[in-house]
Regions:
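Short acidic, glycine-rich loop/turn motifs
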Residues: 38-45, 112-116, 200, 217, ...
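Hydrophobic, proline/glycine-rich low-complexity stretches
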Residues: 1-53
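Residue-level signal for inorganic ion chemistry
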Residues: 125
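A short mixed-secondary-structure module that forms the rim of ligand-binding clefts
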Residues: 62-118
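Short, contiguous, well-structured surface segments enriched in hydrophobic/aromatic residues
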Residues: 39, 59-60
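Short, conserved beta-turn/loop elements at beta-strand boundaries and strand-helix junctions
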Residues: 130-134
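C-terminal edge-of-domain segments
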Residues: 2-12, 135-245
Length: 245
């Protein structure tokens, strides 16, 4: 599915940054890959580093794609949601559902690295499942038949023994009747970043030089990565950014 890449005027700085990074790395097939982490956190996150946390257990991680970027309603385009597709049968989603039984939303940490522009985003997110049927149908219809089949399986008890060799054909035939309706296993997880650490790494310090002999190189002056912290202020409904180094 093609990302919504048009950025309206005066949008939030996080959305501007992440869309710019996605566009500049879109030639890479894995440019939309996102790592999401969930764990039981004992202490609140440190103000200047997303890594100084104490976990009560090993964090549960999942790698997925950013399928779309949307504006959160009633925030005047200042708060952004990252849409991800998941299968409800995965351990990751089952764990989140257990967590949400007595909570309104789940805190997740997401990270993405862009090799071409040498950038890294680490995001503290509020996360929730989208339950609006119209929205679910919209994204479900964006999938092709093969992608839809990944969210559906046929109970072996419902397949006759003499048809076992054609199980794949039976699956396609079975699912073709239901493919217009979203699978019960299809879920939309929306990540809403509220605190973002953006690191821009310098290009390699040693580069080839046309005036040097083979295997010789020119050493460039050492440069440090630039680190920025972006925070969403709910009361003011605006983002602010500070450079950390």
């Amino acid at each position: 599915m093609k990302l919504s890449i048009e950025t309206p005027p005066n949008t939030n700085i996080f959305k501007q940054g992440i869309i710019k990074s996605l566009n500049e790395n879109k030639q890479l097939i894995f440019s939309k890959k996102l790592t999401i982490c969930h764990s039981s956190i004992k202490n609140s996150i440190n103000n200047n580093s997303p890594l100084k946390e104490e976990y009560s257990e090993f964090p549960l991680m999942e790698i997925t794609d950013i399928k779309d970027i949307i504006d959160i309603p009633n925030t005047e385009g200042k708060l952004t949601g990252l849409i991800c597709f998941f299968d409800k049968r995965t351990l990751f989603i089952e764990t989140i559902n257990d967590y949400l039984k007595d909570k309104e939303y789940i805190p997740l940490t997401a990270s993405i690295y862009f090799p071409l522009t040498r950038e890294k985003y680490i995001m503290n997110c509020k996360s929730e499942f989208i339950k609006d049927e119209k929205i679910i149908n919209k994204y479900w219809s964006s999938l092709n038949e093969e992608e839809k089949l990944q969210y559906e399986t046929v109970d072996k008890d419902s397949i006759k023994p003499d048809n076992d060799k054609n199980e794949k054909d039976d699956l396609v035939k079975y699912f073709a009747q239901e493919q217009k309706l979203p699978s019960k296993n299809f879920s939309l997880l929306m990540l809403i970043p509220i605190k973002v650490w953006h690191t821009i790494f310098p290009m390699p310090q040693v580069i080839a030089h046309i005036n040097k002999k083979k295997f010789e190189s020119l050493l460039k002056p050492h440069k440090m990565p630039k680190k920025f912290l972006m925070n969403y202020d709910k009361e003011k409904n605006e983002w602010n950014s500070v450079q950390l180094n």
